[in-house]
Amino acid sequence: GIGSPMSTFAIGKNLKETSEVIGHGDFKYKVDKKWGVQNSNNFPVNHCHEMVMDNKNRIFMTTTHPKNNVLIYNQSGKIEGSWSIGYSSAHGLTIVDEGGEEFLYITDPDKHMVCKTDLKGRKILELDYPKEIKEYNSAEDFKPTETTVAPNGDIFIADGYGKDFIIKYDSKGNYIKHFGGRGDKSNQFDCCHGITLDTREKNNPSLLISSRT
């Protein structure tokens, strides 16, 4: 099922099967348990971790099934397409508009990779473990959970299930720097699972990083 703002699109309107409302205050949602239901034989999922919406209001969702790393839904919950890049544990998903063309960044902590694709699933760039950082002895140390991308194309990777570093690359995948790491200090993390870029102050953007514990 999906929770959606009661005033958003057609989702949450004319729901005959449920009157369940979640949330509180001004943020209340009706649950449509039939939204997004698909044939599990044609579109196996296993687990899903993240969704993003493109400029056409389509929803892209990662799954951990190697047959369908990404499922594409329209606003009505119908599947418009699916594709795979061969990942077994697709996790974090970020969408970025680069000059009018949109791209996805997918992390796979089990495959120890980050992949940039177009919206049709064509691989543009892959990043494996950062050999430039001495704490990483092998790919097994690198288990990325999320990415965010700056307006200039710089890529920030949160290694949330690995060494807990935030690793910065340029748009071509060249290593720039890293910071953080696991620990109890104010500049360290313990499972830096999520990361995004706050650009509300255009001249002073900030990284927002969630540390689970």
Label each PLM-derived region with a short phrase.
Residues 9-34:
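Blade/loop signatures of beta-propeller domains
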Residues 68-70, 112-115, 124, 164-166:
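Structural signal for beta-propeller blades
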Residues 33-41, 78-84, 125, 131-137, ...:
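A short beta-strand motif characteristic of beta-propeller blades
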Residues 14, 32-68:
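Beta-strand-rich domains and repeat architectures in extracellular enzymes and scaffolds
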Residues 64-65, 109, 160-162, 200, ...:
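Short loop/turn segments immediately following the C-termini of beta-strands
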Residues 42-56, 86-102, 132-154, 184-206, ...:
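Beta-rich, blade/repeat-based domains predominating
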